[in-house]
A protein has these predicted regions:
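Non-catalytic terminal extensions that flank enzyme cores
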Residues: 1-9, 29, 34, 129-131, ...
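Noncatalytic linker/hinge segments flanking ATPase motor cores
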Residues: 13, 75-81, 140, 180-181, ...
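A general structural signal for well-ordered secondary-structure junctions
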Residues: 64, 92-93, 111-112, 254, ...
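Active-site cores that bind ATP or allylic diphosphates and position pyrophosphate for catalysis
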Residues: 100-237, 244-248, 297-307
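Exposed alpha-helical structural elements
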Residues: 78, 101, 116, 256-257, ...
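N-terminal Rossmann-like or analogous alpha/beta NTP/dinucleotide-binding catalytic cores
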Residues: 1-110, 199-200, 204-217, 274
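Short, surface-exposed, polar/charged, turn-prone segments marking secondary-structure boundaries
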Residues: 30-31, 62-66, 98, 167-169, ...
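Short alpha-helix boundary/capping motifs
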Residues: 86, 113-115, 261
Length: 307
């Protein structure tokens, strides 16, 4: 069981499409099923209109799915029950540190690029907590253990949680449950056995595997695919409109776009137009590049331009 898990914060860009294509091809090449899950945890940036557009864009590309999980914004009771399980085990504590205090600490960075938490609030007494006036976020105590796993693209990985992850937030100060908790609950309860996502999320994997073990769930197999970068080395973002789905759909057919992505993925030697379904028999993880993939400056040359 695989999954698409897009965030409805804008139109998909080329990197999102590339990852979605590989996730779909991997599952379909094994005769597996695909779930769609809308990750709308961020209430400030998520829009229902974007979620509907994501569905249309995936369908336009020929990437179908077999079922859809309820959006994350509707699943707070599920996350609350898992939060309570952590609390019952004494793994949760309130953190009153502001964002500026965390950054002013000049602490080393965690494996996901965030500031490694210093543990300032880890052992506060009940009296010290009662004296705080700020609404707390909630962190989980991580053990000083090594978590090892084999990524399907990046190979063997080992992280020592206390050194590369630190106590991480599972519920924000505004009450919203954090991504790390939500994604583990949803993957486990959705029966997901294979997670394909960008290599920028590799640093989140060890802590998620640890949460799977704490909750007693089997963990999925992970594949962290290379990022697509602009010719000047910049990472793509949804703010760059020239390579998002709105611009691409106005300039090309689904087969043209899939063909160019298949070439970048090593699934065909040239950019010939092809349907996603026709790539299933060619798919192999052995063919996927291991490092960042630079999008050629002439990537869209030859696309059919619609009047």
């Amino acid at each position: 069981m695989g999954r698409f898990a897009p965030s409805p914060t804008g139109r998909m860009h080329l990197g999102n499409i590339f990852t979605a294509l590989l996730a779909w091809l991997s599952v379909r090449s094994q005769g597996g099923s695909m779930l769609l899950r809308i990750e709308d945890l961020d209430p400030q940036r998520s829009r229902a209109a974007y979620a509907e557009q994501l569905r249309r864009d995936l369908s336009w590309l020929g990437l179908d799915w077999d079922g859809e999980m309820p959006p994350q914004s509707t699943r707070s009771p599920v996350y609350a029950s898992h939060f309570a399980k952590l609390e019952e085990q004494g793994l949760i504590y309130p953190c009153y540190c502001s964002r500026s205090e965390l950054h002013d600490a000049s602490a080393p960075h965690a494996s996901d690029g965030t500031v490694l938490y210093s543990g300032a609030c880890r052992d506060l007494t009940p009296e010290q907590r009662a004296a705080k006036t700020r609404r707390p976020a909630w962190r989980v105590r991580v053990p000083d253990i090594a978590v090892s796993f084999r990524d399907g693209v990046c190979g063997p990985q080992t992280e020592r949680l206390a050194e590369t992850c630190g106590d991480f937030i599972v519920r924000r100060s505004d009450g919203v449950y954090a991504y790390q908790l939500a994604v583990v609950c949803d993957d486990a309860l959705g029966g997901v056995t294979e997670v394909v996502r960008g290599s920028d999320l590799l640093g989140s994997t060890a802590r998620q595997l640890w949460l799977f073990s704490v909750f007693g769930y089997p963990a999925p197999q992970y594949y962290h695919v290379p990022l697509l970068v602009a010719p000047d080395g910049r990472r793509l973002s949804k703010r760059e409109r020239d390579l998002d789905m709105e611009a691409l759909r106005a300039r090309c057919t689904p087969e043209q776009l899939v063909g160019r992505l298949a070439q970048l993925a090593g699934l065909q030697p040239g950019p010939e137009p092809v349907r996603a379904a026709d790539l299933v028999s060619r798919f192999s993880w052995e063919r996927i590049p291991r490092g960042e993939i630079v999008i050629p400056a002439n990537f869209s040359d030859g696309f059919r331009v619609f009047p």
